[in-house]
Amino acid sequence: MRSHYCGDVNRSHVGEEVTLVGWVNRSRDLGGVVFLDLRDREGVIQVVYDPDLPEVFDVASTLRSEFCVQVKGLVRARPDSQINDQMRTGEIEVLGKALTILNSAPALPINMDKNQHNTEEQRLKYRYLDLRRPEMAERIIFRSKVTSAVRRFLDGNGFLDIETPILTKATPEGARDYLVPSRTYKGQFFALPQSPQLFKQLLMMSGFDRYYQIVKCFRDEDLRADRQPEFTQIDIETSFMTSAQVMDKTEEMVRGLFKELLNVDLGEFPKMTFAEAMRRYGSDKPDLRNPLELVDVADLVKDVDFKVFQEPANDSEGRVAVLCVPGGASLSRKQLDEYGKYVNIYGAKGLAWMKVNELENGLEGIQSPVLKFLSEEVVKGILERTGAANGDLILFGADKANIVAEAMGALRLKVGEDFDLLQGDWKPLWVVDFPMFERTSDGGLHAMHHPFTAPSGITPAELEADPTAAISDAYDMVLNGCELGGGSVRIYDAEMQSAVFRILGINDEEAQEKFGFLLEALKYGTPPHAGLAFGLDRMVMLMTGASSIRDVMAFPKTTTAACPLTNAPGFANPVQLEELGVSVVEAKKEQE
């Protein structure tokens, strides 16, 4: 039905007859000539119909937006005065000779020109229309190019594309599982996989030493802009490779993606330890485009007569840190109060500040509500350590170290955006040397990555003796403040795996029930292995500049995990529930 895609026709086709199909992007009658913008997935081209062919002209005059049509005509160059540099096909147009309406369209329920006139609910309900818009089509096509390039790279490096089960067993991976009731085993449930973690480890034990899969994963968790109940991972696992080798290979892949698809040279990725990232940026996924850093001043304020500073400065679990904001002294009290409210969201009780007006005038050149509690020596020490200059603003965080990191890390990002401080387009890095475990709110321990991550250079006995001191052989790839992917060397010794389970409060009986197959498999010559998983949706979101992963997925869910297009989820047929042995305790349909 077509000879070319609309967006592929160019000056080299002048004088040729072409057959095009697509949708009417826009139609206008200007002085007895109909100009038709025809759109398909590759772009838009202008088609011209004049009255010399009255039957065709009359049909063209009836066209409206989103009619599906076939066009036949002659490619000709536009006059210089009519060249449109904003269109890929702007140097040419098609003189229409024939026109067939393949399907009509009623008045549209969404605006096809600018999505700011549509709510997200509207866009998702009429997703098949939304995806026709060029910016959306470009993102979906770009996503396809990413997966194609990933497959070429991994195939070329000896990786095997192997599928793993979707119906599997629930394992504790940090989020709630989506459960699927079994009809043949009443009262028992499959779980949709949060990741293929255990199966890809089993593949290493099976001798397939280089595996990959572009795979759907499922997590029943609270959603935000970069989370979905179902998402896609680029999942990679290798045997007989160290963490450094895995990092080198996957970095090579990502650098190749950016060069091939964006013509961007990322350069070699720097490495930073978890401890350094938290100390300098308050985050284990720092955005290095932002030049602001947290500066510790606890030693300077530990003796001041101000409990807000003094107590955390003398607490082994506390921290006092500051941000120095260039030019920030111009902020009003109201603006500073807004920043105070912002850090409240992250658990901070308040935000002390200090304006540097005239350094040369000592304390008289400093403005701060807490200045009366600080000696000239303390103020001088803070100014010297931060490198503050006239016109700068110093913001204080003082609390438990984790609260200071979270609140001041978030404030750092907000201030960086507000003051337009971001430098450069792309700043990747590796974050390494994560703690094996972190404390939970009830005082227990939780695996910082997952329970199958190997510790670095430690025996099972040493790990159990002091688990909070253990460092994992794990690594995260971070780009512009987003975690692109994370991975680790895996535990390949049954004794070490059992030790980790015990530390996490999983006794031997529970471990056998949930992970007996893994512990058994570990006994049979399991090779050293390591891997990494990339979030494909997030990667494409960053590479395309989209504001949400929903804009790079064909059919995403809303932030309430619903699909307005299909009205999923829905109520099950009572007969089906009876067959499954499932009864609904309570179901309340939300009122529209």
Curated annotation (Swiss-Prot):
Keywords: Aminoacyl-tRNA synthetase, ATP-binding, Cytoplasm, Ligase, Nucleotide-binding, Protein biosynthesis
Residues annotated to bind L-aspartate: E173, R219, H449, R490
Known catalytic reactions: tRNA(Asp) + L-aspartate + ATP = L-aspartyl-tRNA(Asp) + AMP + diphosphate
CDD domains assigned to the protein according to its UniProt record, in alphabetical order: AspRS_core, EcAspRS_like_N
Pfam families for the chain: GAD, tRNA-synt_2, tRNA_anti-codon
Gene Ontology annotations of biological process type: aspartyl-tRNA aminoacylation
Residue ranges of the region described as Aspartate: 197-200
InterPro entries: Aa-tRNA-synt_II, aa-tRNA-synth_II, aa-tRNA-synth_II/BPL/LPL, Asp-tRNA-ligase_1, Asp-tRNA-ligase_1_N, Asp/Asn-tRNA-synth_IIb, AspRS_core, GAD-like_sf
Keyword set includes Nucleotide-binding: yes
Subcellular location: Cytoplasm
EC number: 6.1.1.12
Annotated family: Belongs to the class-II aminoacyl-tRNA synthetase family. Type 1 subfamily.
Described function: Catalyzes the attachment of L-aspartate to tRNA(Asp) in a two-step reaction: L-aspartate is first activated by ATP to form Asp-AMP and then transferred to the acceptor end of tRNA(Asp).
Name of the protein in question: Aspartate--tRNA ligase
Organism: Shewanella loihica (strain ATCC BAA-1088 / PV-4)
Encoding gene (name): aspS
